[in-house]
């Protein structure tokens, strides 16, 4: 009877081997088509699309490696009675199958979690770099799945009767009790997490959001029309997250946040994710969990368990492409997929700076700016300007898109001063040029500090030049002229060398108003200075600072800004040094 049972088992497995091979090839092509279709339809890969592509890639590996290996071995055994499983092939099959089974379970759970997060907390989802978190989640999923599934191949199995001794018995009860329990618990956790997240998503979509919309309409009907007219906030059916494009002071886009989806798109994506979760739970998760439980309970692996596990794994790889194809958002025709294949082969889509992104159901084209916030010299020719579609992000609807200007000093500096409080010109490059390496001293006599005569003479000449420039067009004219025409060259000519005096930079800093109330005062008309009371600005750490007697530790240490009043300078008349400071109290 044992031989007859073994013969029936072998016959059932061999009769299904050809079907597994054909279905595996079809699943491989279908999932590859889905990946190309998603890539072609969505120019900007969002976390949800990335997880769908990873799930399709996992199914490709499932159909290509373990299922195809099992089918080929069964066909070889059918063709030759001497051929059988060996230890290496069986270990590779078991490791790859359980790695991909766990990776599929966790990827589906992560997909449902991201959808719940996006629907329930839309603002937090867009501000939390969900794409990076999705990539990290996929890396963790594959690492955990691979480590756990590789342990049976390196010794974590039943040593009494090894699973690769007679054939390849890959059901968890034949591998070992410890592995079977760990695998079943992880599988159960992934299934429960996916179902809970889908339930919260459906509740938020079908009940919570319509209830808030009714409350908003009720509030808008009471007083919203008086407050804001037809476009008041109270008359909106629900809260919408605006699309945000973040740019720096140079006009270059640094990052962007997508706005709220339309009701149709949101419902389509929610239905797709829910269908994928229920598909996996009904065809793969629950059947494999039931088989594992009964096999561990009875410590046996009858043929129906092997057939059920293999066919359930094959069915999910075939049905996932059909589910994604049913969603209009990710459905692409043959021409679009072919163009995507050509672009991938020619590596035309590798440069992200020249591409276009999809925001607010329109197209946005990135425009590169120079240091002044204007387009480069080559784009001044009207013949080189390309026409954009009628609906794009350069002129977006005001309630849908917001543009933010984030200067470089705000992103890269530790200074927490609110630089947005002071209005600036859009083309201004130096929104804030820190003067932390300068020192301003107003002595009673310019020669009292013991400065070198060469420097003092140069200083007087520079002050006379500054007075002449300010009389002509303002003290900031030379620096702004350098920024506006010195970089690109005036009139399109070659740029002049950056021959820029330090005193001009210091004057620009001191005459530029800062937003902080405790900062230096803003630009004011220059008052006539008494003879000998010319401001002198030295750098902490320069040879001039050591010549006038600054402490060595201060000049070699942290740079700071020191400002002294005119009264303190008049009250002090002697020499000064480390033990006799010029100012009674200084803040570093």
UniProtKB/Swiss-Prot annotation:
Glycan-bearing residues: 86
Residues in the Cytoplasmic compartment per record: 39-49, 113-133, 196-275, 325-588
Modified residues annotated as Phosphoserine in this record: 413, 435
Any single Gene Ontology cellular-component annotation: plasma membrane
Membrane topology: Multi-pass membrane protein
Region of interest called Disordered, as start-end residue ranges on this chain: 445-474, 511-550
Bias (Low complexity) ranges: 530-546
Highest taxon listed in the record's lineage: Eukaryota
Record key words, sorted: Cell membrane, G-protein coupled receptor, Glycoprotein, Membrane, Phosphoprotein, Receptor, Transducer, Transmembrane, Transmembrane helix
Principal location class: membrane
Extracellular side: 1-17, 71-91, 155-174, 297-303
Gene Ontology molecular function: G protein-coupled receptor activity
Coiled coil stretches, renumbered: none
PROSITE patterns: G_PROTEIN_RECEP_F1_2 (PS50262)
Record-annotated membrane-spanning stretches: 18-38, 50-70, 92-112, 134-154, 175-195, 276-296, 304-324
Pfam families xrefs: 7tm_1
SUPFAM superfamilies: Family A G protein-coupled receptor-like (SSF81321)
Family annotation (InterPro entries): GCR_153/162, GPCR_Rhodpsn, GPCR_Rhodpsn_7TM, GPR162
Record localization: Cell membrane
PANTHER family: G-PROTEIN COUPLED RECEPTOR 153, 162, G-PROTEIN COUPLED RECEPTOR 162-RELATED
Purpose: Orphan receptor.
Family: Belongs to the G-protein coupled receptor 1 family.
Protein's name according to its UniProt entry: Probable G-protein coupled receptor 162
């Amino acid at each position: 009877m044992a031989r007859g049972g073994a013969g029936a088992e072998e016959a059932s497995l061999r009769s299904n081997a050809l079907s597994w091979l054909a279905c595996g090839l079809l699943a491989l092509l279908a999932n590859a088509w889905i990946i190309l279709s998603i890539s072609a339809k969505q120019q900007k890969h969002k976390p949800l699309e990335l997880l769908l592509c990873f799930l399709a890639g996992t199914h490709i590996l499932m159909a290509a490696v373990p299922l195809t290996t099992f089918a080929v071995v069964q066909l070889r055994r059918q063709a030759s009675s001497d051929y059988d499983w060996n230890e290496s092939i069986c270990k590779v099959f078991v490791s790859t199958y359980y790695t991909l089974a766990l990776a599929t379970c966790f990827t589906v759970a992560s997909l449902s979690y991201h959808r719940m997060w996006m629907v329930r907390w839309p603002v937090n989802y867009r501000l939390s770099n969900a794409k990076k978190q999705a990539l990290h989640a996929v890396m963790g999923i594959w690492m955990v799945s691979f480590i756990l599934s590789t342990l049976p191949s390196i010794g974590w199995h039943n040593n009494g009767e090894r699973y690769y001794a007679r054939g390849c018995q890959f059901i968890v009860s034949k591998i070992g009790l410890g592995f079977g329990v760990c695998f079943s618990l992880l599988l159960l956790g992934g299934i429960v997490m996916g179902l809970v997240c889908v339930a919260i998503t459906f509740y938020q979509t079908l009940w919570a959001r319509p209830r808030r919309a009714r409350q908003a309409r009720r509030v808008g009907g009471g007083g919203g029309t008086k407050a804001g007219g037809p476009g008041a906030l109270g008359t909106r059916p629900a809260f919408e997250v605006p699309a945000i494009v973040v740019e720096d002071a140079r006009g270059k886009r640094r990052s962007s946040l997508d706005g709220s989806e339309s009701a149709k798109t949101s419902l389509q994506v929610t239905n797709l994710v829910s269908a994928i979760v229920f598909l996996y739970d009904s065809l793969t998760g629950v059947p494999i969990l039931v088989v594992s439980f009964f096999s561990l309970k009875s410590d046996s692996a009858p043929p129906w368990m092997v057939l059920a596990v293999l066919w359930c794994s094959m069915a999910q790889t075939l049905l996932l492409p059909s589910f994604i194809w049913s969603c209009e958002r990710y459905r692409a025709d043959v021409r679009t997929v072919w163009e995507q294949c050509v672009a991938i082969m020619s590596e035309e889509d590798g440069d992200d700076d020249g591409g276009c992104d999809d925001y607010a159901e329109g197209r946005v084209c990135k425009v590169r700016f120079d240091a002044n916030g204007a387009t480069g010299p080559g784009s001044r020719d009207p013949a080189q300007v390309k026409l954009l579609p009628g609906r794009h992000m350069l002129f977006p609807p005001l309630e849908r898109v917001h543009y933010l200007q984030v200067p470089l000093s705000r992103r890269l500096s530790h200074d927490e001063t609110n630089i947005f409080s002071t209005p600036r010109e859009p083309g201004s490059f130096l929104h804030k040029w820190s003067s932390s390496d300068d020192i301003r001293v107003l002595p009673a006599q310019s020669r009292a500090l013991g400065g070198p005569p060469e420097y003092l003479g140069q200083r007087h000449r520079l002050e006379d030049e500054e007075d002449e420039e300010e009389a002509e067009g303002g003290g900031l004219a030379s620096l702004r002229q350098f920024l506006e025409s010195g970089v690109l060259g005036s009139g399109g000519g070659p740029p002049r060398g950056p021959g820029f005096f330090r005193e001009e930079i210091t004057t620009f800093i001191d005459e530029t108003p800062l937003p902080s109330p405790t900062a230096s005062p803003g630009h004011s008309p220059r008052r006539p200075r008494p003879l000998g009371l010319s401001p002198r600005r030295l750098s902490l750490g320069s040879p001039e600072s050591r010549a006038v007697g600054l402490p060595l530790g201060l000049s070699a240490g942290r740079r700071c800004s020191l400002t002294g009043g005119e009264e303190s300078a008049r009250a002090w008349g002697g020499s000064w040094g480390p033990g006799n400071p010029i100012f009674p109290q200084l803040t570093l």
